[in-house]
């Protein structure tokens, strides 16, 4: 019996380690993911709520690290929910694990220095990021995936 229990504990530890090791997927690009009406809806909803973006979950503003504006859209809005549901088809997490939809506006000269979407001692780490570009034409800007050398 002892040997059986030890085997179960070992199996549990192996499964836990496998589950917690980061698994990096190749970035994917989906052209025309949003309709023009959906883009307009997001822009209109966010327009009045845009605030200077913070750098940490403590609402600290440091424009040497990040210069942009952010608004958070209610994920229960029917159009926002539909967009998020379409994003979730490509992920292995349920809707209840999602944050509100974050809208970020970068004006000319805006930036966000290299960072990870993670916070020290925070239980709510982001496991996935789905980036939706609302404008086709822009200059500069890039998203880098250092663990994938991309």
Where are these regions (language model features)?
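Fe(II)/2-oxoglutarate oxygenase catalytic core
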Residues: 2-150
């Amino acid at each position: 019996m002892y040997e059986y229990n030890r085997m179960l504990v070992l199996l549990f530890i192996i499964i836990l380690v496998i589950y917690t090791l980061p698994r990096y997927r190749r970035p994917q690009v989906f052209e025309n993911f949003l309709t023009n009406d959906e883009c307009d809806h997001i822009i209109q909803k966010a327009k009045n709520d845009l605030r200077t973006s913070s750098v940490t979950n403590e609402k600290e503003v440091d424009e040497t690290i990040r210069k942009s504006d952010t608004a958070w859209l209610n994920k229960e809005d029917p159009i926002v929910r539909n967009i998020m549901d379409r994003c979730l088809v490509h992920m292995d997490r349920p809707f209840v694990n999602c944050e509100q939809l974050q809208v970020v506006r970068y004006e000319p000269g805006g930036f966000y220095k290299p960072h990870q979407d993670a916070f020290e001692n925070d239980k709510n780490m982001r496991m996935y990021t789905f980036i939706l570009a609302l404008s086709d034409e822009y200059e500069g800007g890039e998203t880098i995936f250092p663990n994938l050398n991309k």
